[in-house]
Structures are given as C-alpha cells and as structure tokens.
C-alpha cells in the first residue's frame, strides 16, 4: 500500500526548484500553525542506508525559513545560523514532519526553532537565526 499524505489532510506545496529537488513538500494547518513534511525515498539514503543528514537539514532550512518569512511580514530572509542536533536515524520511506515556531523577532532578525519527527519519534532538533532583508532607501 502506498502512503498518501493527502489522505491525512496534507496538501502539496508549490515551491521553487531547489527545495523540491529533495521531494514534494507537504503542508498542513494545525492549531493556528503550519506543519511541513516530505516523504523520504531511497535516493535520500547515505551509504549506511539511512536518510542523509544533509537532506534533513535542507528541508529544515527551507521550512523554518517560511516561519521566519511570515514573522518578517513576508520580507525576504536568509539563514545566517542553523544548528541541528540529530536524535535518531530516518529510514527511506519515512514521512518526516517539521513543527516549528518563532521564538523571537526583531526588525532585522528572526529566531526560529523546530523539531523533525517521524510519527511520534523526534529525529532532529533545530534552531536558527534568519536575517530579514529590507529594501534600503536610495538617494
């Protein structure tokens, strides 16, 4: 039987080509917040057979950046620091979900943290800082 995120209330996200290269991202609104997810495949595996940590970090960077972007009133943001603590291995075929939150936002910086999970199992804890890019006055 094939896993279908849409059957669980997830909807496919439109995104730019870079994050979609790791797979179609999914989004779901819960408790006045968004969650994001992607379905891992054999192409994401490292030589040991687990999903490569870089794949998980790329997904976390992109989706936590969405939280920062929303907190910055949709002004462009760039990652200036991101810390990842791996807690458990992810197996190809796992559906990886990210739950995130903005912990602080200033005019120029947004602080975000999140948990990557497979079902009830936390697999990584991430925190980071995003710089808000604002147009500079000309003249």
Tell me what each language-model feature is:
Residues 1-139:
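Terminal targeting signals and extreme-terminal segments of soluble enzymes
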């Amino acid at each position: 039987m094939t896993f279908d995120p849409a059957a669980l209330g997830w909807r496919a996200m439109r995104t730019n080509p870079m994050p979609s290269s790791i797979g179609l991202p999914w989004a779901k609104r819960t408790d006045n917040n968004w969650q994001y997810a992607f379905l891992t495949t054999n192409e994401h595996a490292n030589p040991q057979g687990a999903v490569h940590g870089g794949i998980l970090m790329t997904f976390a960077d992109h989706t936590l950046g969405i939280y920062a972007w929303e907190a910055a009133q949709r002004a462009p943001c760039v990652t200036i620091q991101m810390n990842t603590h791996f807690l458990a291995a992810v197996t190809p075929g796992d559906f990886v979900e990210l739950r995130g939150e903005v912990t602080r936002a200033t005019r120029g910086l947004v602080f975000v943290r999140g948990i990557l999970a497979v079902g009830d199992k936390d697999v990584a804890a991430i925190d980071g800082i995003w710089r808000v890019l604002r147009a500079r006055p000309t003249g």
